[in-house]
Amino acid sequence: MHQAITSAQIAHWFTVGAQFANIRITNEAKKAEAEDNATEVRSDKAFSELSSPEKEKSDDGNQRRKRAQLPTGPGTSPPSLASYEYPILPITKNRQELVSLIENNSVVIIRGATGSGKTTQLPQFILDHYAERNIPCNLVVTQPRKIGATSIARWVARERKCTLGSLVGYQVGLEKMATEHTKLIYVTTGVLLQKLVSSKTLTEYSHIFIDEVHERSEELDFLLLVVRKLLRSNSRYVKVILMSATINCIEFAEYFGSPIRNQMNPAYVFEVEGAPYAVEEYYLDELKTMLPVGVNLDLTLPQDPYITEEMYNVAVSLIQSFDEMEAKDHRRSEQTGSTTHPERGSVLVFLPGLAEIQYMKEALSKLVRKRLQVYPLHSTVTLEEQNGVFLVPVPGYRKIILSTNIAESSVTVPDVKYVIDFCLVRQLACDKETNYRCLRITWASKTSCNQRRGRAGRVSKGFCYRLVTRHFWENEIPNFSIPEMLRSPLASTLLKVKLLDMGDPRSVLSTALTPPILGDIERTVLQLKQIGALSVQSNSQRQFDGDLTFLGRVLAQLPVDLQLGKLIVLGHVFGCLEECLIIAASLSLKSFFAMPSLQQLAGYRSKLSFAQNVPSDFIAYVNAFKAWYTSRAKGELRHPKDELEWGKENCIQIKRIREVAELFEDLKKRVSRFNMHISSSSNPTDYTSLHKQRFILQVVIAGALFPNYFSQGEIDEQLASKELSGNDPKTTILIRNLPPFAFLCYKQLQSLFRQCGQVKSIAFDGSRAYVEFHRSCVRESGVLHEVLLALLRSRHTPALHLQVHHADEVEFHAKGKPIAHLRYTRVNVDVQSHTVSPVGVLSSSVNPEKLPTSRDFVINITEVIDVGHFWGFQTDENSVEKQCQLTAALNMRDLRPLSVSLYPNLLCVAPFKDGQQMAKYYRAKVLHILGSNVEVFFVDFGNTTVVPSSSLRELPSDLMTPAFQAQEFCIARMAPSAQSLILGDRWSSRARNRFKTLTSGRSAIVSLFSILHGVMRVDLHISTETGDVSVADLLVQEGHACHTPESFESQQSHEVLISLYEDMASGRFTPSFASGSLNSRMEEDKQLINQLLLHFCSSGSSAPKCKAVVHGPSSPHKVNFHSMSKVSNFRSVNIERDSINCVMVNENPQDWHERMLVAASVSLSASGSRILLKETSLMPHIHGLPSLVTMLFTPVMELRTNEDRTCFTGALCGLGWNSVSQEAVLPEHDIEIAFDVKFEIEDITEINALRGTVNRLVCDGPNGLLNLSQEKISSLQEEARERLIRLFIKTPSRPECTPVYHDKFKKWNLVDRSQQMEIQEKDDGKSKGVLFQLHPITLLNM
């Protein structure tokens, strides 16, 4: 069993009370060890005199101390400094020397091994030094990660026996445990950086300790730059201490050098030597006796770093050898008289990424007898899985931790004895061509590998095994990693540079420790202009600089990605601030949706459920967060146990959603400083307002994520229909590569998809199978979630396996009967009734006997499912007579109660009462079981009702065979309009009410267009005072619907029906009856199939001995996406598997209009060949929406026209062009759109008007947002919302047009200035730093 961790153990992890070997503190110069490959600076007495400034005068010192004094609140007193006994650590011996060095030098650099006491003890030395002299001080210590800052602060507070937040505290992001009396505070690097950029001085602190400086993150390097600048300008008396276990001392010392006697003198360097326990190092060529036979030591090459299968085997063999090593050590200890039991030391394996962790975990799982407990440690694993790392293993078991570089410094596991290091790391880099981020495997630096080595030897002697040769280590492994500032986007840093206001970005960043490449700075400036944080037209007229806009000032104060910050601001403009704050908080932290490795489908299903039929991860986050927040507010989750249970049921990680809630509150406070507040009326409750708000939110999301736009790829309908053999893509998936006699294992196929949903039928055809899922609700019409779950399964499990009997074995048991023709015969399996039937060669999807006698016939509409979708029955004399006979036959019988338990799709007899008449019984099917009641569907009429379960009766067997009289109908060539899609879930409430008013409970005339998947697609006509009216035309005229083409399969069916009815009318139609011999052959085949099933599926038969690998599931209607910008040309687009849209099925491939997907995160694969999208939203399929959204949110736009300039054909959107070079400013992000609907000058004018309204809510100056009243803000928000809705809902709708791309594709400045009308806002100088410039309009020849 897992054992709990005590507080004493946790304390023990930081400073183990053990003796240290070979401890030496020195200030004498000496050469570094060969393995470190770095020269260390150790200063002698003369160097010390040069490095130390002259002694300050007493009055100067008093001024410094006064500036550092903390404010005190009224009625409170600062906590006392308890006497403290320092633990025996390497750094303790020279306490006074260190204090003296720090007090006499502006900057001191300290290097010491992990566990030497730098972080925990040195700040306390200074704290006690000042306390003894009764001099105020204020110390801040930075840590690169939250977990480090919080845990160290807790440990120091506990050691000093003070309350956390009094004398000692911490601040990590939004979480702060400190008061005005706190004298020692641990913070993350970003927290201190934000404070310094805002205050532009260091004087809030007396001492600044910057820890782990070797990591060289972008934030850390910029912090060093800011500290250095301020130290030399207005904060000369503040002391700065840089600390690390592995640091290039010379580089840092020279960077912080100070001018003394007309020369630059490097900062003072002090080294602490010593480690808790010795750690022995071994390289691959020193492990020959422990390696598997045949391992090639020259496998790893610097040009292509990766892990081969052989190297995985080496690591596994090493782990197995530890038992023998420990047994030898135990025997030696017994000979010396020790009686301790051998303990199996924990193993920490460093791997570059999650894929490698999973591979290694799979390899270790084969060692079933080795008693291993394997824990993955990666940023994506759930918190529950992470906690297992710190648990004490079960006695007799060995703990194996498979970790990325997160365990280098963020997480310390104390009982690690062995470290296995592949010397690889997956580093975030910025692609030079696209500027997208990508994670690439590369060789870790020596400094990182030495940090990893330090993870062992905390409680006993340690061992480090580097899986490279010593020669490779010495000659190929780099000494230091490339600073993040040289390989990552610089957007956040550049905004802080602009806030510092100390010069243009290029000149400021040129003073960094390792200055970024000039081209990277220039590119980032352009991207800030693109996002709207810098003005597109700078007053300085410099292309690579710009004035900070109001949006830029807001973004610089928000601890979120810049696009998420823009989302918050746009959310305020359009009245959906609360939702945007939730999204920004959710996407800034680890996802609170649990996707555990063993329950991926359950997590995906939960996310789909929260999305509420909207294909958007953002909507799922909003709905899940609100569901949790509302439940807590109502007191439903008052007890932690109830909350955890709710989280488990909904696949929500409670701890993480709480963190999102904290960040949500923090962001809400931050934006309130800019006069942005959540409106009390921003939570609509009625159906129309709810969907209107949802649409506005989707547009706002798209606006914030410009230019991360992707369009849905087209599907060849004809090929897709052929591949799916005419089955419904909304309910069916395809399995390939099936073995002979595959119908014998249909139950295995069914069980493979049991987690996805209820399988209705399986159709075998050759080596393929078509698995159809059951539609549990007659009111559903879209792609089933079951289909999406099955397709997702194929992403997690690439290959499916079936246990099958060999074909020869099957034929042998046929006892001489010829069955070779059954190997790949067409077979249909009804899973519900477990009937297996062969399919005839002449089988057709259209049965003439079941067709109406004429294409035009009268029906009675009994149940409206949705607009244009309803159930009814024919009212001709023959049909009515059949219904009467069935009803009479049922109600004359003595019907028996049901003898079986209720289940969905059970055929039965149910009562129905029409008006005042007595209830009668009718044939019915169970839909849903609702406690003691049940919802039933009357199969001869098409309506549904809820009746008591006890009222159901058994359907007599002889009355099961007559065909059901009810028929499902859909109106052909009609789809929802933009108005319906925006104001409802496909259809608005007004459209639904109008359709019900027109059709419910009345007779109507229908004209049969086609029959598709059992549904009659018809033209519906009703009688009015003015005559017969087409319902579709009426709904189109009223703006509820639009005309749309039918699918390829529907068109095919239409042609078949037209031909069939023409033949019937002319007397040429001849019914095709199968011959007696064919019917006999079919019956024989059915008997043979049943005999084979009876033999091979019975419990007494031998188990299958063969394993068949089948391919799938798949769907030819699965959607692919491609980038709308130039940056992703010739790269495939992949959506991350945790996204709702990672598998999408196009249910309307006949609609050729462009559909847009937006993504919050766009990155490159390691190879650079694929674009990876994370957190996506598929926009509603409104014709012209991609063009409208792009034109609305692009910084600059140039309209395209036809040759005669009589109409607009498209637009080029992006950052515009350089007036000198005439080239595009940021060509890789330009988007060329070709209009598929007709846009007029009035539409462009409306876009400009909306951009102007946005500007009035996102600007500085006397008329800026900070100076507006809440009434004025609400008025402008309502104006923006109404303009937005009016832009997308145009009556009459914009006519279709064929897209025409410009012959000078993505070329700017093609419009003559004389043919262009420049649009200028009325600027009285009271609005500054606006977000958008207005688009010029190209004049047309009318």
From Swiss-Prot:
Q: What is this protein called?
A: ATP-dependent RNA helicase TDRD9
Q: Where is this region: Disordered?
A: 31-81
Q: Lineage of the native species?
A: Eukaryota, Metazoa, Chordata, Craniata, Vertebrata
GO cellular-component term (any): piP-body
Whose protein is this, by species? Danio rerio (Zebrafish)
A molecular function (GO) held by this record is: helicase activity
What superkingdom heads the lineage?
A: Eukaryota
Gene3D superfamilies referenced in this protein's UniProt entry, alphabetically: 1.20.120.1080, 2.30.30.140, 2.40.50.90, P-loop containing nucleotide triphosphate hydrolases (3.40.50.300)
Q: Describe the reaction catalysed, as an equation.
A: ATP + H2O = ADP + phosphate + H(+)
